[in-house]
Amino acid sequence: MQVILLDKVANLGSLGDQVNVKAGYARNFLVPMGKAVPATKKNVEFFEARRADLEAKLAETLSAAEARAVKINELATVTIASKAGDEGKLFGSIGTRDIADAVTAAGVAVTKSEVRLPNGVLRTLGDHEVHFQVHSDVFAQLNVVVVAE
């Protein structure tokens, strides 16, 4: 199925590219998420007329994401208190939702889907490096300190 991309899609293309994808991928993900439209003659003409607007909107979201990434990097560290045993192991774990809530409480709005844990959930006390993907091209990094309650 031929589609016109309205946004940058990983491993597929960027704004304005006409790509051939499987019909299910287009119907179930790309079109409902607003990332693509079917490449009909009418849609191609409509897209060419709105190309400048879409490029400006894409640049605006990219600059907003870069600003959020700078704010996350400026935080440097976030401290999370959790119950732990004598050897420094946590009772339970700290996942993406807990980290997103802590960063949001510190002043930068972050969703749990933007949190990337390279080594899985946090199960020990101490310093842990956490990555954030605030946009498909923009990444940020933060140090999370887990302390015992």
Curated annotation (Swiss-Prot):
InterPro entries cross-referenced by the UniProt entry: Ribosomal_bL9, Ribosomal_bL9/RNase_H1_N, Ribosomal_bL9_bac/chp, Ribosomal_bL9_C, Ribosomal_bL9_C_sf, Ribosomal_bL9_N, Ribosomal_bL9_N_sf
Pfam families per the UniProt record, alphabetical: Ribosomal_L9_C, Ribosomal_L9_N
SUPFAM superfamilies reported in the protein's UniProt record: L9 N-domain-like (SSF55658), Ribosomal protein L9 C-domain (SSF55653)
Single GO BP term: translation
Any GO CC annotation of this UniProt entry: ribonucleoprotein complex
Gene Ontology MF terms in the entry: rRNA binding; structural constituent of ribosome
Keywords: Ribonucleoprotein, Ribosomal protein, RNA-binding, rRNA-binding
Biological function: Binds to the 23S rRNA.
Stored PANTHER family: 50S RIBOSOMAL PROTEIN L9
HAMAP family referenced in this protein's UniProt entry, alphabetically: Ribosomal_bL9
Family statement drawn from the similarity comment of this UniProt entry: Belongs to the bacterial ribosomal protein bL9 family.
Record protein name field: Large ribosomal subunit protein bL9
Species, as recorded: Edwardsiella ictaluri (strain 93-146)
Gene: rplI
